[in-house]
Amino acid sequence: MKNFRRIGILTSGGDAPGMNAVVRAAARAALARGVEVYGIYEGYKGLIHDNMKLFSSPADLCNIITRSGTILYSDRCLEFKTPEGMAKAIATCEKNHIDGIIACGGDGTFRGATDLSNHGIPTIGIPGTIDNDITSTDYTVGFDTAMNTVVQMVDRLRDTCESHARCDVVEVMGRWAGHIALRTGIACGASAVAISEIPFDAVSYTHLT
């Protein structure tokens, strides 16, 4: 088994609630075991451009657990998908003697983590996306907060709808995954829910008006 002495942590893709908690927990666990931890800024872009900061003690992670977004910032990096970009990322790891990477993000982040692993850099992926579209896990980091936020907004919107005796259509995020729409639709008592996984015809909803 490889002896990890120094690791890097990054957040990539769209930000999700709870990413700071992930960074804090992973970094503190590593520091408690005598492993040096680098926070890599702007996802894989920071890995390519050697943009990182050493977390020398748990004190560097104080008061971030309740903050939204990610203190490491996040970005989508097309260069990382190229052979040249991957070579730069590997060179950064070798230069800084980084033994492994922890990457928090969605499906694109996981593809990047797989590529890093295939190039000899041990990488762990932590599912962090409001879309909840990562396999082999019931809930991704950020999904629960996204659902609760939508429910709160719909509860407020319902008052206006009832005041004007009308029906409103609410569009939520999720890209090609309908988890937010389905779960919040059930929680809010929606008359109907349309998700991308199930083909639907807008005409079939006219009876609701």
Residue ranges and their predicted role:
Residues H164-P199:
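Conserved anion/nucleotide-ligand pocket segment
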